[in-house]
């Protein structure tokens, strides 16, 4: 779509997104915020949350083993033939406008999307190796539960940009 046609560019289409997040059930305020953006996105980019059980940590248990367990569960839960984006502090940063461009590109490709949030120690090396892209939300350290909400909001913002919706005001 060109700039003139962009208003109709992001109608409901075959592309869906999944957020695979390692961790326990989110606190009510995170779940409520995520659900709000999930609802807003539903007609542009349906977004499904898949919670992945965290690895066992604690006395006598190596964190690397827990991360490896989480990685195996994430990889097992991934649908086939999806565009995989791992959220990682060492990944590439995007502006909201750049994210909108990526979303437009993905929709043109027709593949579903999978966004991955790792556990406390991040992603297992096997997960990062399988990812098509690695993103960082910025140099700040964010609680993993908050990342769910921030990602959902940024996906909504990108979709709103593509649809010429007034939500995004730079």
What are these regions (language model features)?
Residues 12-41:
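N-terminal beta1-alpha1 ligand-phosphate binding loop
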Residues 20-22, 50, 116:
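Short hydrophobic segments within beta-strands
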Residues 25, 89-92, 119-122:
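Short glycine-rich anion-binding loops that position phosphate/pyrophosphate groups of nucleotides
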Residues 31, 35-38, 68-72, 125:
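Short, surface-exposed alpha-helical segments at coil->helix boundaries
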Residues 46-114:
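S-adenosyl-L-methionine/SAH cofactor-binding core of RNA-modifying enzymes
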Residues 101-138:
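A mid-sequence interfacial segment
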Residues 125-169:
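Structured adenosyl-cofactor binding patch, chiefly the S-adenosyl-L-methionine
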